[in-house]
Amino acid sequence: MATDWLGSIVSINCGDSLGVYQGRVSAVDQVSQTISLTRPFHNGVKCLVPEVTFRAGDITELKILEIPGPGDNQHFGDLHQTELGPSGAGCQVGINQNGTGKFVKKPASSSSAPQNIPKRTDVKSQDVAVSPQQQQCSKSYVDRHMESLSQSKSFRRRHNSWSSSSRHPNQATPKKSGLKNGQMKNKDDECFGDDIEEIPDTDFDFEGNLALFDKAAVFEEIDTYERRSGTRSRGIPNERPTRYRHDENILESEPIVYRRIIVPHNVSKEFCTDSGLVVPSISYELHKKLLSVAEKHGLTLERRLEMTGVCASQMALTLLGGPNRLNPKNVHQRPTVALLCGPHVKGAQGISCGRHLANHDVQVILFLPNFVKMLESITNELSLFSKTQGQQVSSLKDLPTSPVDLVINCLDCPENVFLRDQPWYKAAVAWANQNRAPVLSIDPPVHEVEQGIDAKWSLALGLPLPLGEHAGRIYLCDIGIPQQVFQEVGINYHSPFGCKFVIPLHSA
């Protein structure tokens, strides 16, 4: 009879659209084919209404979770004389908007359209009675849900205790009240109150598990594998590898010798390079002898002029700005260089430098006074210079009145001291001092009397002369003199240039 199922705790599956309901059977109507549940739960959440009625046509599956004992269903009152199938399985359940419907048996494949379900309210959880028959089977869904809910709440209380303890003691905690706050609480429980089957009460023992790891055995296995595969061993204590990598070389190097150049006479002045190597100065007579011996061995004047012109032009290009100034974007701002040359070999060196500068798109203005007879070296250099875009002038009036980017001085020569008394020499010195452009002197002589053009930079050839402060900052260029040529004139020589052809020198 239908009254036999009153008070039973059942689980009704209404499909994916309506979900699963649990509750205690309060009424079974065979005429209208409906079943009512009191204190219902929808998908594990307490429902708003105290009672929900289902139609048989919307029931997909019906499970009996608990059958009440005798006398447990007397408080439900008189019920309709109806009958319910043995299990109710194979039927579907639907809910009307008013919570009522008809009980109609249908196959599991048929279902009705889902209906709206009333909203949930904040209803206090109630205890569910469990009969002695439940001891032989698993706990009901309601009991398991209540236990998991209490566990999840206690879990959150433990793990969120820092939030309450970190507040200021005098700071009041805001409280929420009302139905809306209760709904938010139920939503939090629905989101974060999942079933937690097991919460570990003890922390993980890291030290104990680390003690179980045999590191020595693992490292021995790795070393054995590397020896067999031929890879480099990691190294064992008290064992020294037979070979070292390039970055593991611990062999002590020889002490650094900074004085690698020794001259045969007393040194009046010494210089040093950026790396600390000592470069002594030599006298003009020894320098002249060095060039003469080099020329005898094949380093002719033409080669020396070419090498000097290349080194001087490289230094001048660097002083003009290098790639920042000489690039296709600055074609409209070509640097201007004024060359002041005398009628001697020093002047020929300047003309060679001007030719290389003109080949690098530098605007070169060459000043050379007119003489009836010129040296062959000067004639050859002028012939090459005339094939460039450089400009040659013989009068100081043709020199630019505005400042140029650089002035290269090649007027002085120790063998032609009388030229300093010439009007063109004095006029050229006056023009250079008034132009206010930086001056680079190529192979300047040692002046006994301070006069002429004060240079900002000076370029020495091979080995420097004992130049004074008027020479500015000293640079040294390599003109290709072999080491044995130095030894032939009594100089113990080791190149200080390294990877460069022009290096700066500093006063020691």
Swiss-Prot record:
Domain Sm: 1-68
Known tissue expression: Expressed in theca and granulosa cells in ovary, and in spermatids of the meiotic division part II and apical membrane of Sertoli cells in testis (at protein level). Also expressed in brain and mammary gland.
Pfam families, sorted: Edc3_linker (PF16598), FDF (PF09532), LSM14 (PF12701), YjeF_N (PF03853)
GO BP annotations, alphabetical order: deadenylation-independent decapping of nuclear-transcribed mRNA; P-body assembly
Domain YjeF N-terminal: 283-487
Region (Disordered): 95-192
Gene Ontology molecular function terms on file: identical protein binding; mRNA binding
Modified residues (Phosphoserine): S131, S138, S140, S161
Domains (record comment): The DFDF domain is unstructured by itself. It assumes a helical fold upon interaction with DDX6.
Protein name: Enhancer of mRNA-decapping protein 3
Provenance organism: Homo sapiens
